[in-house]
Amino acid sequence: MHARVVSMEIRPMDIEEANRIYQDLVVPAAKEERGFRGALLLTDPYTGEGVSISLWESEDDLHASEASGFYHRKLDQLDALFIGTPVRKHYEVSVQEV
């Protein structure tokens, strides 16, 4: 399993709106992508710091979601709420317990 981790800063007054967009638009669309296995959005309502973690069955599935434009379309939906540019990294999931 592989993870895309996106670190971001959101204006604290916009955290609730970011949560709504992620829950109502980003996650349902991600469920339609091949290999999608789950997502988390972690936010600090005081500082505006946030981390999005999406889980993918394989590295190929993760990269396919970027090549298809899915990742950038979803990022664009949140763009007006960001301070600065989000930082994206990829990881192999070493341990998972749910």
Across the structure, where does each feature detected by a protein language model lie?
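Low-complexity, intrinsically disordered Gly/Pro/Thr-rich segments
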Residues: R73-Q77
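Short S/T/G/P-rich N-terminal loop/turn motif that feeds into the first structured element of a domain
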Residues: M1-G50, E57-G69, L81-V98
